[in-house]
Every structure is written in structure tokens, then in C-alpha cells.
């Protein structure tokens, strides 16, 4: 049985999450609320919410866990060419936290292969916007000719970034945002981005799975560190445009 959490109930041990032989591997608990305080507690423990409209709030801690080490980010020759163009041409911008709610809404509306509807519900948008207002959630946005054309958002505590979702209205717009984030996190010495679940798109960019135990141990250490600055722009991409950065073709985004 998946535990039901009342408003004051703590999360169970992550070891109680459903295993791979079940229909919902990684499912840890369910609740009726998505209060900011519970959401913060979840991230500090390596837990995240994922559910659809009409369902209770479902809390997950999968094993293994998909991560992206910034130092292992792969840049294909075509993406490197795109990044050089972004650096060179002034009509391309990367903005941070300029339109966080708009990025979330765009991620919610983006079509996903094999998915109907969206898990980014109005309740999710409200909860993460609250984290954004407190400085614990951020959007990295690709702009072209004054229009937001792609981006991503996620949660940050200490020296840990938890990626949530991305979208692109034009080719490579989400990759430009991710590459800019990775370049900034490299500069800051961050060792890990949480990607939650394995996808071919993330794997093509250098993502890999690690054991949940190792992931949670890293989270506990990283979130206890002082927070990093969140002021940067596309100029950080210069570090990713050398021929040493290589990658395979991409697949599906979350």
C-alpha cells in the first residue's frame, strides 16, 4: 500500500518506494496537498511530485535516478554550430527568470510523444511559482527577435539543481537554454543536475542513471551548501563551443 500523507505527516523512508516489479516503480506516497513547505521538504529529500489532473498528489523517488553531470554534457557538432550563432548574433538572447510562469505554461502546453494531457497542472504551476518568488525555482529562457522561443525551469537549493521540464517552439531552443544552464553550473562547480527519469533525449546529452542511495547522499550534501548566484546570460556559452564537446543525436524531451 502507498502511504497517504495528512497535512502534518512526514514523508516515509525512500526505501519504501514501490519497486521495479510494480506498475509504478518509485512511487513513495500520496497526499491531497501541494503546499510549498511540503514541496521544499520533498526536494531536500530527493523526492518530487508527478501526477495528472484528477489524481491525488503523487510523490516519487525512483531507483535508479537519472542525472546529468555538467562536466559530462555532450555538444554535437550541429549544436556547437548553433551555440556559436547564438553567441555571434545579437537577436539571440538567453534570459534568466524573466518569465517563469510563462515558461511553465509553455512546458505544460508542449506536445510530448506518447503522452496525453500534462502533469504540469494549475496546482503545479501555482506551487512552483511560489518557489520562484522565494528564490528557489528558476527559468532559463531562449529569446529570438524579442520573442521567447524555448526554455526550461527547475528548482535549486544550495549547490543542487533539480530539472523539471523544457520546451521549444523553434529547433534547438530548449537545448540552447540547457547548454547555457550547464555552462553556468560548470562555472559554479556544481556536480549534478537531477533529471528524475531516463529519456533518450537526456541520455544523448550525457545524462546517466545512478543508484538512488548515491543520489540522495549527494543531495543531502549539496543542499546544505550556500546558494549559487543566478545572474548570467548567453556569454557563458563560449566555454561549450570548443570541438572537444561531442554528443549523439537527441530524442524525446520531458
Curated annotation (Swiss-Prot):
Q: What species does this protein belong to?
A: Burkholderia cenocepacia (strain ATCC BAA-245 / DSM 16553 / LMG 16656 / NCTC 13227 / J2315 / CF5610)
One Gene Ontology term of the molecular function aspect: leucyl-tRNA--protein transferase activity
Q: What is this protein called?
A: Leucyl/phenylalanyl-tRNA--protein transferase
**What does this gene product do?**
Functions in the N-end rule pathway of protein degradation where it conjugates Leu, Phe and, less efficiently, Met from aminoacyl-tRNAs to the N-termini of proteins containing an N-terminal arginine or lysine.
UniProt entry tagged with the keyword Ribonucleoprotein: no
Documented EC number(s): 2.3.2.6
Give the stretches traversing the membrane. Answer: none
The gene designation is aat
Q: Which HAMAP family match?
A: Leu_Phe_trans
Q: Which reaction does it catalyse?
A: N-terminal L-lysyl-[protein] + L-leucyl-tRNA(Leu) = N-terminal L-leucyl-L-lysyl-[protein] + tRNA(Leu) + H(+); N-terminal L-arginyl-[protein] + L-leucyl-tRNA(Leu) = N-terminal L-leucyl-L-arginyl-[protein] + tRNA(Leu) + H(+); L-phenylalanyl-tRNA(Phe) + an N-terminal L-alpha-aminoacyl-[protein] = an N-terminal L-phenylalanyl-L-alpha-aminoacyl-[protein] + tRNA(Phe)
Report the subcellular localization: Cytoplasm
Pfam families xrefs: Leu_Phe_trans
Q: Which family does it belong to?
A: Belongs to the L/F-transferase family.
Q: Which GO terms describe its cellular component?
A: cytoplasm
Q: Does the keyword Cytoplasm apply?
A: yes
User: What InterPro entries would the database entry show?
Assistant: Acyl_CoA_acyltransferase, Leu/Phe-tRNA_Trfase, Leu/Phe-tRNA_Trfase_C, Leu/Phe-tRNA_Trfase_N
